[in-house]
From Swiss-Prot:
Catalysed reaction, written as an equation: 3-dehydroquinate = 3-dehydroshikimate + H2O
E.C. numbers: 4.2.1.10
Annotated family: Belongs to the type-II 3-dehydroquinase family.
Lineage of the species this protein comes from: Bacteria, Pseudomonadati, Pseudomonadota, Gammaproteobacteria, Pseudomonadales
Protein name per UniProt: 3-dehydroquinate dehydratase
Amino acid sequence: MSTILVLHGPNLNMLGTREPEVYGHETLADIDDRLRSKAAEKGHHLLHLQSNAEYELIERVHEARAEGVDFIIINPAAFTHTSVALRDAMLASGIPFIEVHLSNVHAREPFRHHSYFSDIAEGVICGLGSQGYDLALKAALQRIHR
């Protein structure tokens, strides 16, 4: 059994109510429950954490390394464009990851076009709403089984 960690960055706790025209009506709990169920169906364990605090996400990445987490799916949200520290934690962990964004960041404000994570990620999925998480989980499981 492999372990996958899903990390959600700032403001994602507001899913379902925050700008639903951009982010959709599904809540973060809906997404996490669906992912956990899909992972369990395949015989894997899925953990998740949402935090508005950069240091909590960094500490969780450090813990993931010590726990032997096999893969990370991360939506760094606003930290995508600002967090060198979280990028460094991802690199230091050595855990492969996929970057996910609910909206198409390339069709939004120019400051959202740059990511500190894309060049070190296994892949990037954006603009597909919560389905992006499902696709990331599918890809993560395929990579784990290689």
